[in-house]
Swiss-Prot record:
<dbReference type="GO" id="GO:2000331">
    <property type="term" value="P:regulation of terminal button organization"/>
</dbReference>
<dbReference type="InterPro" id="IPR006671">
    <property type="entry name" value="Cyclin_N"/>
</dbReference>
<comment type="similarity">
    <text>Belongs to the cyclin family.</text>
</comment>
<protein>
    <recommendedName>
        <fullName>Cyclin-Y</fullName>
    </recommendedName>
</protein>
<keyword id="KW-0966">Cell projection</keyword>
<dbReference type="GO" id="GO:0030424">
    <property type="term" value="C:axon"/>
</dbReference>
<dbReference type="GO" id="GO:0007399">
    <property type="term" value="P:nervous system development"/>
</dbReference>
<dbReference type="InterPro" id="IPR012399">
    <property type="entry name" value="Cyclin_Y"/>
</dbReference>
<dbReference type="GO" id="GO:1904115">
    <property type="term" value="C:axon cytoplasm"/>
</dbReference>
<dbReference type="Pfam" id="PF00134">
    <property type="entry name" value="Cyclin_N"/>
</dbReference>
<dbReference type="GO" id="GO:0048489">
    <property type="term" value="P:synaptic vesicle transport"/>
</dbReference>
<dbReference type="GO" id="GO:0030425">
    <property type="term" value="C:dendrite"/>
</dbReference>
<dbReference type="GO" id="GO:0000307">
    <property type="term" value="C:cyclin-dependent protein kinase holoenzyme complex"/>
</dbReference>
<feature type="region of interest" description="Disordered">
    <location>
        <begin position="1"/>
        <end position="23"/>
    </location>
</feature>
<keyword id="KW-0524">Neurogenesis</keyword>
<dbReference type="GO" id="GO:0019901">
    <property type="term" value="F:protein kinase binding"/>
</dbReference>
<feature type="domain" description="Cyclin N-terminal">
    <location>
        <begin position="186"/>
        <end position="284"/>
    </location>
</feature>
Amino acid sequence: MGNSSCCLRTRSSSGEDKSYNNDGQYIRTNQVEFQYVNQVFPRDETSTNFLPHISEREVTEGYEEDPSTNPTARPTFMERSKSEMKLKDNRRSCYMLDALAAGGHHPGILPRSLRKSSSCSTIYIDDSTVSQPHLKNTIKCISLAIYYHISNRKNRGHERLMEIFEERLHPIFRDPIPPEQMTRDPDHRNIYRFVRNLFSSAQLTAECAIITLVYIERLLNYAEMDLCPSNWRRVVLGSIMLASKVWDDQAVWNVDYCQILRDTNVDDMNELERRFLECLDFNIEVPSSVYAKYYFDLRTLALANDLQLPIQPLYKERAQRLEALSRVFEDKIQSSSLPKRARSAEHLVFEHPAVLS
C-alpha cells in the first residue's frame, strides 16, 4: 500500500531513559524500548483508471473470517470480553441463589435480582432499535468494547504498533501525558468521556458509533496491530473521523475536530485519516448484515454489564411511535436510493419571449 511503519516493543535491561525522537526511530522510557521499523508494502503497478470497485474486489486471503466484513464471524470485542462476561454471569447466579435462600429475611433482594420476561400477552422492550439506537447507551457499549480490546490484548508486552497512531510521537493534548499512563490500561470511564466529547461536539449519531467500532476492528485486523494505552485515542479519533464522513455523510471537516481537540492541527488530522484509509485498503463498506450483527452483540455486551436501558411494556401508542421512528429512517434510505426521474424532450416546456406587434 505504500510506505508505512510499525513498532516492536521489547523490555529493556538498563534503567536509563531516553527522550523522544521526532523521526520516530527509537524511543525508550520507563525501561521499555520502542523501536520503529519502517516497512514498504508492495504497490500494484496499475493505473487508477483500472482500479476495481469495492464490490468487485476479491477477498484477500486470511480476511474471510474478518468480523468487520463477514456477518457470520463473531466480533473481536465479544471474544475479548468472553471471560469477563462468564465471570459476571457466575457472580450473578451466586447472587440470585443467595437471594433465593434469604428471600424470607430480605424481601427486597429477590425482586431486584429477577428480570422481566416477555410473554404472549405482554412484551417488554426498550427505546433502542436497530435503525435508531439509543445514543448514550451505544457510546457506553462502544467504550466498553474498546476497553476490552485494550485490557485483553493478546500481545501484552510485545505489542505491534504503528507510528502514526502513537500518542508519544503525535500527541493530541498539549499537556504531557505521564509515562505511567502510556503503559497502564485506561479505565472504561476515561474512554467513555473521550468518545462522548467527540460525539456531542460533532453532533454525531448512534449509528456512527457502531460504524466506528467496525472500523476499529477492521484496522486491527488489516494492519495486524494491537490497541494499547499509547495509541487508543488516535485510533478512535481516526475511526470517528472516517465514520462521520462515510456513514452520516455530514459536512464534517477535519478542522472541526481541531476545534474540539484544540491542541491538534489540520495537517496531523489529514495524515491520520490518510494512513487510516491506507491501512483499511480503502475498504470502507459496511454491509447492513454486519451493522446489525454489531448492534445486537453490543446489546448482549450491555446486558452482561448491566448497561441495558430500562424496559417497559409495549402498548399501542408506544408501538406506533417506534414504528414511526423506523419508518422515517426507512423512507430516508429509500428516497436516497431511488433514481431521479428524467423528462423526455416531448414534454419539455420552453418559454419564448413574446413579440408584440
